[in-house]
């Protein structure tokens, strides 16, 4: 019997399946500026969407913090106890001065925002199944597994969202993860190693962190990119492999890890995708998945430049303008849309 949770409560129809909380953003005495990650990007995305009149506060779903019981669905108690040591959190977040902070401050100022984003991903999973789509304007902590964190990822939100669906939602027994962050998603790969219910497609720069050879064994469709890969090659590989993934394993839900660290100039991602290329990438994924009438959950994952918030907002606006998301969502396929994809042929 699943435990009682606050994350699977009813959401009124008037609210769009876009999940966010002001508590996502990490701010504490400027320490967040010591990491290249823009630790306030999530709020900036929402502000841009409000400025464009797409959303108001009353249309958003307020994320709730994942409880310890929620986290124990995936995480070991030993790992959660390790997070009570500031030096462990400093290592995971890659912000060395965190080691000198009392852990109660680390819990409140660093881990609580990450737990709230994790709760948001779990909530968005249920919403995606109910509404056909959902976006958590946060989450995507794809380097964290049940018993280890790293790369700014302290909680395994993708694994948690899928396991919650498997345990609590009738008819959800197969999932596909489409991970398009610039880095290999070794966390969910370790968690779902050997689990035939979960198909993982991962497109990443082969030369950068984490280089987890063991975790790569869980990838069913692996696309390794070279330094400086640009739009044309990238978009062709993404579309072709998304199509093939859905042919090989037709899931009940897709979790799309939409990292923007593929952006040109991102010194950690090492790829050269333009802002327009990222917007097109997200469009391609949504259109192909929705053409199969499969629910899709998008999380925003990595992105290490100040302009990534604007790009994420532009992508969400584009999905709305094309009718791929909205309050009354129509299933739009490449065939009945006036806006072409890349070539639909699969060689």
Swiss-Prot record:
InterPro entries the UniProt entry points to: HDAC_classIV (IPR044150), HDAC_PDAC (IPR050284), His_deacetylse (IPR000286), His_deacetylse_dom (IPR023801), His_deacetylse_dom_sf (IPR037138), Ureohydrolase_dom_sf (IPR023696)
Protein's name according to its UniProt entry: Histone deacetylase 11
Entry-linked Gene3D superfamilies: Histone deacetylase domain
Additional information: Its activity is inhibited by trapoxin, a known histone deacetylase inhibitor.
Source species, domain of life: Eukaryota
Organism: Mus musculus
Primary role: Responsible for the deacetylation of lysine residues on the N-terminal part of the core histones (H2A, H2B, H3 and H4). Histone deacetylation gives a tag for epigenetic repression and plays an important role in transcriptional regulation, cell cycle progression and developmental events. Histone deacetylases act via the formation of large multiprotein complexes.
An example Gene Ontology molecular-function term: histone deacetylase activity, hydrolytic mechanism
Subunit structure: Interacts with HDAC6.
Root EC class: hydrolase
Keywords for the protein's UniProt record, in alphabetical order: Chromatin regulator, Hydrolase, Nucleus, Repressor, Transcription, Transcription regulation
Enzyme Commission number(s) from the entry: 3.5.1.98
Family stated for the protein in its record: Belongs to the histone deacetylase family.
Active site as annotated: 143
One GO CC annotation: histone deacetylase complex
Reaction it catalyzes: N(6)-acetyl-L-lysyl-[histone] + H2O = L-lysyl-[histone] + acetate
Subcellular location: Nucleus
Stretch list, region Histone deacetylase: 14-318
One annotated GO biological process: chromatin organization
